[in-house]
Structures are given as structure tokens and as C-alpha cells.
Amino acid sequence: RDLNTVLNKIATYATMDRETAEDCFYVLRRKDANGNDNTIEGLSIRMAEIIAGAWGNLRVQTRIIGNDGRKITAQAVCHDLETNFAVCKTVDRRITTKTGKTYSDDMQVVTGNAASSIAFRNAVLAVIPKAVTKRVINEVKKVALGQAIDVETSRKNCLANFAKAGVTEAMICQY
């Protein structure tokens, strides 16, 4: 595995445009026990999918392993076939309201899918070392926050510079 190639793929996919870069992160607002607002943020399932695809030689599987009427349990296994390192992660999600009423069948499916996605993300991020991806993740975050140029903007700037020299997009494509 060539780490430079992996990191370049992650950066290319995740910074295609600002919207894609934004999809690589999640932010949740929650109240703590004292009623104070807390912000929870991290890498999204989309970023985990991009990292897993770029990493290569990786097998990831998710499945629902339990539904006891109160919670759904999802499990994900991620196996790096090059290093033979594997991780199994489980995620529980409640399927009852605050008053104890069980979610509809439809909402249980949605909750199960969400739990599977979270388990997938957790397993992938446990197998692929953060030390390897930290730098590129920071670059993606800059694009998401509008502090860096995404691939599409970079392409437009490049074409504009060529146009100043009399080179058209058609000429570039033909070349």
C-alpha cells in the first residue's frame, strides 16, 4: 500500500467540492446533565467510506445482530487484508420514545440503518490509523469551512489561467 497514493485519493474524493467536504463531518448539539449546550463533532460515515475506498484491500461488513424491542444492535467488522488486522464494533440505538412507546416498523428500519452506518464508521476508523489520515482530514475540514480551495474551484482557476494564455478548455481536453 502506497500511503501517498491513499492520501491523495482521500483528498481528491473528499474535496471535489465544498458540499462533499461538508458531508465528511457531523456536528450534533446536545444538552448535558446540567442543561448546558454541548457540541459533538467528528468524522461522518461519508468520510469513513472515502477513507475505506482509498485505503484498499479492506473488507467491511455490517449487520443487525439484535432487536429486543427497546434497542437495535448493529455490528460491523472491518478487516485490513494487507496487515491482517481486524476490528469488530457494535452500536446500540434506542427504538423507544422518551415515554417508552416503541417506534413503528419503518422507524426501526431507519434506526437500524443509522446504527449500521455508525458501526461501519467506527470499525473503519479503528482499523485505519488516525496518524496516517490526520493531515488530510484537516485539509478536508478547511475546504468544508471555506478556508481552502476545493477541486472544482481549483479547476476553474486553472482553466482561467490557461484562457489568459489563449488556451481553451477544448484544446486542453484534446491534448
Model segments located where?
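Polyanion-binding surfaces on beta-sheet-dominated domains and ring/shell assemblies
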Residues: 1-72, 77-175
